[in-house]
Amino acid sequence: MLMRGWERGQGYEHGHGHEHGHGHEHGGFWERRPFSEVHHELTVAYATHKIRRVLDDGHEQVDEVRLRSYNGKLVGPTIEVCPGDTLKILLRNQLPFKEELVGDHPHVGPHGANVTNLHFHGMHVSPAGNSDNVLLSIGPNQDLEYEVKIPTDHPAGTHWYHAHKHGAVSIQLGSGMAGPLIVRGDIDQIEGIREARERIIVLQQIPYRLVTDPYDNTRQANMVEEFPQLFEVTWQRELVPQGRRVTLNGEVLPTFRLRPGEVERWRFIHAGVHFPFRLRLVREGGNPATESIPYYLIAMDGITTGRLDQVDVTEMHPGYREDVLVHAVGRDGRPLARGTYLLVDEVEQNPGARVLARVVVDGPPKMMRLPRPEALAALAPFKPIRDEELTSTTPQEARFEVQVVKPPPAPEFRFLINGKEFNPHDPSRQLTLGAVEEWVVSSVGAAEFFPGHPFHIHTNPFQLTDAQGRVIWKDTIYVPVGQQVRLRTRYRRYIGQFMLHCHIVTHEDEGMMQLLEIVPPRQDAGGPPGGGSGSHH
């Protein structure tokens, strides 16, 4: 792996790879030569890993698993770039050629599990050619060099890359084929963040099939090969009771260490395949309702909010990223008492599986300051979209729908957008470059099985209004069944085809995806550019 174009800034330190108990860390900030080429190589192949299981009685067991992986690791390498850089990634597919694992039919459901590609999730870059083009297919023993030109005005933030070959997304992402993609920039250099140590925390659900019967040769032991094991119900009813746990940078129950009074920047990336997380920091043995440790939300989906919002809990659905500042002080402003604290997931119903990490506060005090809110306010990258900026009075519609084809006890479903399953041969929904539009996104059907769907759209972020009436920018938003969300977005800079889909990726592989295309304005069109077609056609 070669990364060019970076120089160390003062006080820089970095925890390479995924060292036990540390994750990805750095202190200080990057200085760079502008407009550099950043080179990486990703080799996709089966690799053997060790993953701990934690049983309800406290006993632990280490499973040896065999998974499709990047560069032989459970989490892909961290890639760091600056605005104006060109990212070049040589993707080598060294998965074995098997006829049943390379086919492209049917168009929905699992297929082509050994064919791959890359998506640069959250990046505002071209979706065409060998850039962020998820229509590419790289088969076994094939290589492709991606070339991603990052615009000079790209906001600094937390993004990620992952496999996105339709029909194979869930099996490959469920195997851990994902890694952090960090855009460095202005926010990294402000006082209160520049001095903070950083942890990149990749949260994953690896639903490998556990086979304990040595005479059972009907299934692939300790691998992710079977589509049903990727669904939410399998994780909840079968895998968690076996001791399966969420991994953080490939580890189960890592330990993080802070000094009293210290500030750290944690970059959370939900790279899992199904359940959301509700993350809270609490003192070990304490009451979460009264003894949680607040932290400060500064970015969502890689986009600086421009605020320093104190929160007790953060809710993350698949595809989400959240940057928080953890300040090791109590609610009274004094250094946090030495001891052990826990990062817990309140979504998890099994009490033994709620703890995701231990946070040990120890050592001499290191009193650090948080950034000033006005310094963050100056870094919010986008202006709100007001009514007068809209170029169409008719919103675009995206309706996630699950139809129950066969009822329990062996239910079957269809996963649709606007009444249709994804078909790559259908015409794309046409959108016009330069248009500014509103979207109405809703979820309907089968709420007892699937309570909602995270809407994700490639290439351009969108704005929405949160429960407090504030404008926020994201690229992924959860839409509960029976509700709708109104979004606004600008189709800036890039033409080409890209996707919107549910980021519970089993739903995506089953057809809950739609092809979009941004096209140049018609030459005979007068006035401001118009909108899109309003429907898949």
Predicted regions and their residues:
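Histidine-centered copper-binding motifs that mark active-site loops
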Residues: 1-325, 330, 358-381, 388, ...
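C-terminal substrate/ligand-recognition segments
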Residues: 397-464, 475-501
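Histidine-centered divalent metal-coordination motifs
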Residues: 119-121, 162-167, 453-460, 501-507
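Residue-level "contact hotspot" at macromolecular interaction interfaces
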Residues: 80-82, 137, 257, 315, ...
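Short, surface-exposed ligand- or partner-binding patches at beta-edge/loop junctions that are enriched
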Residues: 158-164, 278, 331-349, 493-505
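Active/binding-pocket-proximal capping segment
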Residues: 283-302, 445-473, 505-508, 517-522
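Long, well-ordered mid-to-C-terminal structural blocks that present hydrophobic/aromatic surfaces
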Residues: 321-323, 327-329, 341-348, 375-386, ...
